[in-house]
Each structure stands twice: as structure tokens, then as C-alpha cells.
């Protein structure tokens, strides 16, 4: 805006004779005053990089004197970006339509509050005129000109200038049949203005989506899908850089790939946010349920008081698994007992857990005692599935049989002792008789 206003102020005095009032009745020849003729006032480039040299070589316009050669050094302002290429390639050679520079000048005067006949700029039913002009210009963008964007714009501008120089003489010298496209517009200011507005609408429809320029989303909201019948010019932002049709297709392909990544990242960010929110809500909820059991593999060596100290008993795999599970449950109960809070409910739970642990320990010791007793009884020593009742009965019978054997052996011992006494007394009698 500042550059355009400064340019307009600089051109008011030199171009007073060529000034053109913006009116619907103005002939189309006044719009031949191209912005390219005053481009050196705004953008200083070397001769090989000046893409506007073609317009200066035509010689159809006379460049007015510059207000100051070092204007940018005086005000320490950056030069404006290069002019965007026009989208009206088919009508580029026609001199009855205003150029892109005139479009920018018209928009500048309109936005600056100048007295302009708005009925010529846009019809009441066409509201996308100003937006289409703003979209086509790089200087309305809100982002800094990156290296890639400058390269693309420069290449497209050079191609457009070359095609414009070659297409003009070729079209004028070729006496071929009339084109099969739409008929040429009728002469006159009203007809030229109508075709000009129609061409601007088509150019706005070819504009690319702003997401191509901004591959990363500017906000966390997902872009809304456009309705099928929506106007493309109304859906586009004002900071979209211009591009040709082929470049638009390439940018759309890149846009599809970038959108997939962006949506994936957005989905991941939303899923991570939801998971973190659920985790925080779970942490904030009070825990009314009992503590979760934690598997702790701790080896606890228990002494079997019923078994002999020197006897090593080896149990089957199933029984060893049962014993290990009992020990693990005991350790878990001890851990839960230590970690539970000291409240009335927790104390009752601790007592109950302690009782359960002691009961399990008693049962385990009793089971070990039965196993040891079974190993001492010959009849059920090899029977691993012998019930406790059978073990007790066989143990009782075995004890009784042992006791009967003991009594029998004691009686035999007594008889032998008596026999010995008798034999000893008889031996003494024989010794006394010889003497």
C-alpha cells in the first residue's frame, strides 16, 4: 500500500498530461499506459535479471523522468516484489483491456478513498473483482518472499514475457481461420468492461489454495470442506501468490501430499491430547477400589518343621508350582499390608489380609507335614494322589503295627535275658563241682 501510494504521488506531476479518469465512458486506449514503464522506480535489478526489459524495448510508451534516483536510499525502504504474471494469456496482446498495473492502481485508489466511479470497477452483482486483483498480487501477501517462491515467480514471469513477445507478432501475421473458442467481444467500453470482469472471474477461479503457500496449518482447527457449488473466488484468501495452470496442477499435487501429513499430525496431536486428558482425569478421580495386585517373584525359604532335618524331599512340578504361588501370594499380601493407608477401613483390611496370610501359611505347613508322613508309610509312599484320610489311616495302622512289633521284641528280649541268667547259673555249678 505504501509503495503504491508513493508511486502514485511520484507519477501525479510527471504524468499529468497522461492522467486518466476512471470512468465507464473512458475509451480503452487510455489504459495502454503500462505499469512496466515505471518499474525502475520501484525495483532496481541488474540488466540480466530485469524481466521487465521487454516492456521497455517496445518503445510504445515514453518513460517520464524519475522523481529521484536514490529514492530507496533516501527513505531506506525495501523494493516492492516483482509484478505477478497475468492470467489472461489469450488476451495479453489485446490493447483494448487494462493491464495488471492499471488494475493495481485502480484498487489502490479505490482503497485509498479516491473519488472513483465504482460502477466501472465492478458490477453490483460481481463482488469477486477486488478479491481477484488482490489474490493475483504478491505484495498483498502476509508472508516474507522465500527463495523458492521468488524462483518460481521469476521463472514463470520470464516464460510469460517470452511467450508474450513471440505470441504478439505470430498472431498478427498468421491469417488462419478464426478460433473455435468463444466469439470476440464487441467493441465499446461497456463490452470491454464486461469481458474484463468475466476474465477476472476466470482468473480468480484458477487461483491456487492458500494451503499450498502455507504447507503447515496456521491454527489447530481442521480446514472445512468447501461445498460443491461454492464460488472459488470466495473461498480463497487474499494472501495467495499467483501461478499458471500447469504450476497450479503441480502445487495441487504437492498440496495433497502435504495435507495427508498435516492431517496425520493433527490426528496424532488430537489423539495424544485426548489420551493425556483421559490420563489426567483418571489421576484426578479418587481411588475407591482396592489396590492392584503386583506380581513379585521373591524366593521365600520356609523350613519344614515336621520333616527330618537331614531328609531332602523333592516334590513334583505341579506341587512346586502350587507352593510357589502360595509364597507369591504371601509376599503380595505383605506388600499390600505395608502400602495400605492407616484408616479404619484399611486396618480392617489389614487384619483380614494378615489372617488370610497366616491361614495360608498354616495350610501349607500342614500339607508339607502330610507329604512327609506319606513318605514314611510304605504302603502310600509312592502314591502321589493319596488323600489325607488314607494317609492318616495307613499311618495309624503302621504305628500300631510298629507298636506290636515293639512289644514282641521286648518279650523276646526278656526271654533271652532269662535264658542267659539260667545258663550263667548252670555254668557256675559245673565249675564248683570240679573243684
UniProtKB/Swiss-Prot annotation:
Pfam families: HLH (PF00010), Myc-LZ (PF02344), Myc_N (PF01056). Keywords: Activator, DNA-binding, Glycoprotein, Nucleus, Phosphoprotein, Proto-oncogene, Transcription, Transcription regulation. One of its GO terms (cellular component) is nucleoplasm. A motif (9aaTAD) lies at residues 105-113. Transcription factor that binds DNA in a non-specific manner, yet also specifically recognizes the core sequence 5'-CAC[GA]TG-3'. Activates the transcription of growth-related genes. The 9aaTAD motif is a transactivation domain present in a large number of yeast and animal transcription factors. This is Myc proto-oncogene protein. It comes from Gallus gallus (Chicken). The lineage of its organism: Eukaryota, Metazoa, Chordata, Craniata, Vertebrata.
Amino acid at each position: 500500500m505504501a509503495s503504491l501510494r508513493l508511486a502514485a504521488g511520484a507519477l501525479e506531476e510527471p504524468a499529468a498530461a497522461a492522467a486518466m479518469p476512471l470512468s465507464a465512458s473512458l475509451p480503452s486506449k487510455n489504459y495502454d499506459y503500462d505499469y512496466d514503464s515505471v518499474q525502475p522506480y520501484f525495483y532496481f535489478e541488474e540488466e540480466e535479471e530485469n524481466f521487465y526489459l521487454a516492456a521497455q524495448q517496445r518503445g510504445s510508451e515514453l518513460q517520464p523522468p524519475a522523481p529521484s534516483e536514490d529514492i530507496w536510499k533516501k527513505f531506506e525502504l525495501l523494493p516492492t516484489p516483482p509484478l505477478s504474471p497475468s492470467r489472461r494469456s489469450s488476451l495479453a496482446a489485446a490493447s483494448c483491456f487494462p493491464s495488471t498495473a492499471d488494475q493495481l492502481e485502480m484498487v489502490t485508489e479505490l482503497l485509498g478513498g479516491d473519488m472513483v466511479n465504482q460502477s466501472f470497477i465492478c458490477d453490483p452483482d460481481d463482488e469477486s473483482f477486488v478479491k481477484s486483483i488482490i489474490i493475483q498480487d504478491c505484495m498483498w501477501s502476509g508472508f516474507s518472499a522465500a527463495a523458492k517462491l521468488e524462483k518460481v515467480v521469476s521463472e514463470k514471469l520470464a516464460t510469460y514475457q517470452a511467450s508474450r513477445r513471440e505470441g504478439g507478432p505470430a498472431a498478427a501475421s498468421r491469417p488462419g481461420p478464426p478460433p473455435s473458442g468463444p466469439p470476440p467481444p464487441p467493441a465499446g467500453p461497456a463490452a470491454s468492461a464486461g469481458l474484463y470482469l468475466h476474465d477476472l472471474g476466470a482468473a480468480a477461479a484458477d487461483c491456487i489454495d492458500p494451503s499450498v503457500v502455507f504447507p503447515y496449518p496456521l491454527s489447530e482447527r481442521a480446514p472445512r470442506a468447501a461445498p460443491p457449488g461454492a464460488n472459488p473466488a470466495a473461498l480463497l484468501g487474499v494472501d495467495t501468490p499467483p501461478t499458471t495452470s500447469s504450476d497450479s496442477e503441480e502445487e495441487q499435487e504437492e498440496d495433497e501430499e502435504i495435507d495427508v501429513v498435516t492431517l496425520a499430525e493433527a490426528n496424532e496431536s488430537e489423539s495424544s491430547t485426548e489420551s493425556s486428558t483421559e490420563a489426567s482425569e483418571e489421576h484426578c478421580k479418587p481411588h475407591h477400589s482396592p489396590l492392584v495386585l503386583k506380581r513379585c517373584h521373591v524366593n521365600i525359604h520356609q523350613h519344614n518343621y515336621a520333616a527330618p532335618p537331614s531328609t531332602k524331599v523333592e516334590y513334583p512340578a505341579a506341587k512346586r508350582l502350587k507352593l510357589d504361588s502360595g509364597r507369591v501370594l504371601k509376599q503380595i499380601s505383605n506388600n499390600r499390608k505395608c502400602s495400605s493407608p492407616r484408616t479404619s477401613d484399611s486396618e480392617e483390611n489389614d487384619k483380614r489380609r494378615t489372617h488370610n496370610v497366616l491361614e495360608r501359611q498354616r495350610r501349607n505347613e500342614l500339607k508339607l507335614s502330610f507329604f512327609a508322613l506319606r513318605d514314611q508309610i510304605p504302603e502310600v509312599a509312592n502314591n502321589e494322589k493319596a488323600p489325607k484320610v488314607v494317609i492318616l489311616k495307613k499311618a495309624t495302622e503302621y504305628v500300631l503295627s510298629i507298636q506290636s512289633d515293639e512289644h514282641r521284641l521286648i518279650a523276646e528280649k526278656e526271654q533271652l535275658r532269662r535264658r542267659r541268667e539260667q545258663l550263667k547259673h548252670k555254668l557256675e555249678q559245673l565249675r564248683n563241682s570240679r573243684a
